């Protein structure tokens, strides 16, 4: 039912704006801003492929997702996130010690992230890094 109520897909410029704001809030440790950028019913899904640490079940809700993402940032303050293109869409690639650790893609509605997908599976990342 929620999908039927969704507006038109966000423009590329809007996705880039939200991803940049998300990156800035993450780097600043601004929990309140992270929550603001996430839709109340946001769903976070991670793919670790059984080879990388990743939540095995979807995480739902802005505060829960923001807490998860903030905790990851606190554990690894040296991470560097860059805006990249994946399958023709804007995404965030996060590097640790120069190595690609994960790629985040999002769906946006009304200026907020409604779906957050993280790929941390090293096999998929190797493929992405060599494209």
Where do the PLM segments sit?
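Solvent-exposed, charged amphipathic helical/linker segments at domain boundaries
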Residues: 1-71
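Low-complexity, glycine/alanine/valine/leucine- and proline-rich hydrophobic stretches
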Residues: 62-131
